[in-house]
């Protein structure tokens, strides 16, 4: 398989959740959507150590509650079932029973334990799942199918593209693979998990270490993106590690733990950037880099304030280097900043230096902003810490898409 190497970590061309050994996936159309695939699954040929992080939204959806309880008690997952078009959220007691039935049906279909099945849903909130359709879809599940592309399509809602990546790295002389898939286009905001993302790896990883590591990875990737400032009731990130690579068990004291974490971070950050780039109606990926901060938390706080600003996002859409909007966002971020030390560059063009405005050519700046990726670099010159956040521009199409979401 053709690869691109970054240090000792290889990024696979066209990598998927099925790239790690022992993982299978597929997707079918069961009738939740008019024509598109709407029910997907991941299966491991052996129970995998599992970890999850979940939305902080008060109204957590039934599938999320069941998955969270399952992982907390069993510590292992062998299959994940995901439906799109219907969130099964705010659907009362019956919605919970429907999600529980999905878990049971998958376990029966794949001949595995019910407490080894995770359930996820995404789509319209407040509508009951048509369980007859879901039941018929689950009957098509197979534990021998390797069709990650169908899985990636089945979990989408307003996304315009699938999101997937995989990397390989050698640990203990064994080739370890980490794959990932995600969905997310709207209702994306830094808040614990922020969308649906599924990570698979054939690494042998201690479950407690896996859970702690997932929180750290999430903070550096998914929690650093925003599209529209809304956080869904269903958002979660799940990771499965089935140990098929047969490396020595990984934990924080393993000599190559940092190598594993670096590889995992690449997967998570790439997926996060794909989500931000595919924001509803978006035409550009915006990357905000804050450096020279006293702490990483302060750098992250400022980066997220700027990337979440609708005024900044609309200015970028209009190719307008209105750096005053960036100043405004920094000012309300809650982080104390010395104005006399502040420097800002937009698209590589310096607009503020040591607290003073810099004359710049508007045409050059418009050209720099008229790119698929726009970088904003903010230098606080107050320390050594840095953070990066990702988002997208805000366009007329965002309103069009969300004004007719249910039609």
Swiss-Prot record:
Site positions (Cleavage): 193-194
EC number of the protein: 2.3.1.35, 2.3.1.1
Active site per UniProt: 194 (nucleophile)
Catalytic activity: N(2)-acetyl-L-ornithine + L-glutamate = N-acetyl-L-glutamate + L-ornithine; L-glutamate + acetyl-CoA = N-acetyl-L-glutamate + CoA + H(+)
GO BP term, pick one: L-arginine biosynthetic process
Pfam families, A to Z: ArgJ (PF01960)
Function: Catalyzes two activities which are involved in the cyclic version of arginine biosynthesis: the synthesis of N-acetylglutamate from glutamate and acetyl-CoA as the acetyl donor, and of ornithine by transacetylation between N(2)-acetylornithine and glutamate.
Family statement: Belongs to the ArgJ family.
UniProt name for this protein: Arginine biosynthesis bifunctional protein ArgJ
UniProt organism field: Oceanobacillus iheyensis (strain DSM 14371 / CIP 107618 / JCM 11309 / KCTC 3954 / HTE831)
